[in-house]
A protein has these predicted regions:
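Glycine-rich Rossmann-fold phosphate-binding loop(s) that bind the pyrophosphate
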Residues: 12-15, 36-37, 174-177, 207, ...
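Glycine-rich flavin
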Residues: 2-6, 22-29, 34-167, 195, ...
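Beta1/beta-strand and adjacent pyrophosphate-binding region of the FAD-binding site
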Residues: 2-14, 167-177
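Flexible, glycine-rich terminal cap/loop adjacent to redox cofactors
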Residues: 9-16, 20-37, 49, 53-60, ...
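A Rossmann-like FAD-binding core segment of flavoenzymes
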Residues: 113, 117-125, 131, 190-289, ...
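FAD-site-proximal beta/loop scaffold in flavoenzymes
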Residues: 153-168, 251-326
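Glycine-rich dinucleotide-binding loop and its adjacent helix/turn
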Residues: 48, 138-197, 225, 273-275, ...
Length: 450
């Protein structure tokens, strides 16, 4: 019988890779894990965690001015320091990195801070040595897409954003997905002049259009300029500014350009071709329902398979994969996965959009409610909340739950449990609400909008 250095070796120590390593080690497997960049992956270091911290920082100005209508008066204007935010963010990320390091060490997994490449299906080159394993998991995550226009070397990506030396005065953001929208809103809240350019005719494709229209309207009212159906043709540098030309002849002069045109599976430097692991056109590793690739002892999960680029999904996949390895497979249910866009206003959703529901079901009922939030009720601020339920007519099952407004993510996370359990509209109606709260509106909507 062949002896290996490890029962299981994982390439990539992001959320999915770390969870795989820990759970496998708890089941008695000998585990190694390689990470050449930083523990915690994209989410902890250059993704959701620092993004949310920056979003929170950007919300204080509006709370400051809103407080005046509640009787607060200040003798001096608040001042914002980008450097202080960056330094404190770095400390928090270092703390989280150390937590991941401790968790792996406590589990008994061996951590190797090096790049890993395939030599054969059981052997990897990790740093300057060869490592063998009975099974190997690819959890190498994703990388920012590079735009193809002339002058793309002047562009920064979402990974670079959190290490910018100073806050720009004017920024052009390329893209219309959730990353672009979140950065646009937080920068606008911090006083930056923001313009978005998107090659598509809409932002946030795939989300419920009614909700997206509300976000787009709010962004425009806040001063964010959105250019759709257009793309950059060329960027040139002039002193401390960048001149941007578009395909439709528009021109912009900005001091920073941020590309947020999505992320692709990070598989380029793994030498997958040596073992003939099948990938899609964009480099995503192709897997079966048990996360097994075309090579029987090689598995993959998380962003690298390009199914759902969400940290909680990767964590669930990790637990499911380990169950498969130890002989008790349990599949991840990809229906009704909640998600949020930390825009201004915040947007969160679970289940089907109205557009998707109309394609899937013959008859649906739509419930919509909009109202001014209590927090802005005594001010001149137009902070309107929009809620939406999508119900199939024949069985009255709630198929979609959407919210635009303050604390949307926290509220929708709770209702995601109801949708996962197959709750009907009657169950919603029979639930007593908490008053006064935004969330109670979801259980008091009685009139069908359409």
């Amino acid at each position: 019988m062949t002896e290996y250095n490890y029962d299981l070796f994982i390439i990539g120590a992001g959320s999915g890779g770390v969870r795989t390593a820990r759970i496998a080690a708890q089941h008695g497997l000998s585990v190694g894990i390689a990470e050449q960049r930083f523990l915690g992956g994209t989410c902890v270091n250059v993704g959701c965690v620092p993004k949310k911290l920056f979003v929170l920082a950007s919300q204080f100005p509006s709370k400051y001015y809103l407080s005046e209508s509640f009787g607060w008066k200040y003798t001096t204007e608040p001042k914002f320091s980008w450097q202080v935010l960056k330094e404190n963010k770095d400390k928090e990320i270092e703390r989280l990195n150390q937590i991941y390091d401790n968790l792996l060490n406590e589990s008994g997994a061996d951590i190797m801070h090096s790049e890993a490449k395939f030599i054969d299906q059981n052997c990897l080159r990790v740093g300057n040595k060869n490592v063998t394993a009975r099974n190997i998991v690819i959890a190498s995550g994703s990388k920012s897409n590079q735009p193809s226009f002339k002058g793309n070397e002047y562009v920064i990506h979402s990974d670079d954003f959190f290490s910018m030396e100073k806050l720009p005065n004017k920024i052009l953001i390329v893209g219309g997905g959730y990353i672009a929208i979140e950065f646009a809103c937080l920068l606008n809240n911090l006083g930056v002049n923001v313009t978005i350019i998107n090659r598509s005719n809409q932002i946030l494709r795939g989300f419920d259009r009614e909700m997206v229209d509300k976000i787009s309207q709010s962004m425009t009212q806040a001063g964010i300029k959105i250019h759709l159906d257009n793309e950059i043709s060329e960027v040139s540098k002039f002193n401390d500014f960048y001149n941007v030309m578009t395909e439709k002849g528009c021109s912009f002069q900005v001091d920073k350009i941020l590309s947020a045109i999505g992320r692709s599976p990070n598989t380029e430097n793994l030498d997958l071709e040596k073992i003939k692991v099948e990938t899609s056109k964009n480099g995503a590793v192709i897997i079966n329902k048990n996360y097994q690739t075309s090579v029987n002892n090689v598995y993959a999960l998380g962003d690298v398979v390009d199914r759902f680029q969400l940290t909680p999904v990767a964590i669930h996949e990790a637990m499911s994969l380990v169950n498969c390895l130890i002989g008790s497979p349990k599949q991840v249910d990809y229906e009704n996965i909640p998600t949020a866009v930390f825009s201004t206003p915040e947007f969160a959703t679970v289940g089907l959009s109205e557009e998707s529901a109309r394609k899937r079901f013959r008859n649906i009922e739509i419930y919509v409610s909009s109202f001014k939030s209590l927090s802005s009720s005594m001010s001149k601020k137009r902070d309107e909340i929009l809620l939406k339920l999508i119900v199939t007519k024949n069985d009255q099952i709630v198929r979609g739950c959407h919210m635009v407004g303050e604390n949307a993510a926290e509220i929708i996370q709770g209702f995601a449990v109801a949708l996962k359990a197959g709750a009907t509209k009657q169950i919603f109606d029979n639930t007593v609400g908490i008053h006064p709260s935004t969330a109670e509106e979801f259980v008091t909507m009685r009139s069908i909008t359409r």
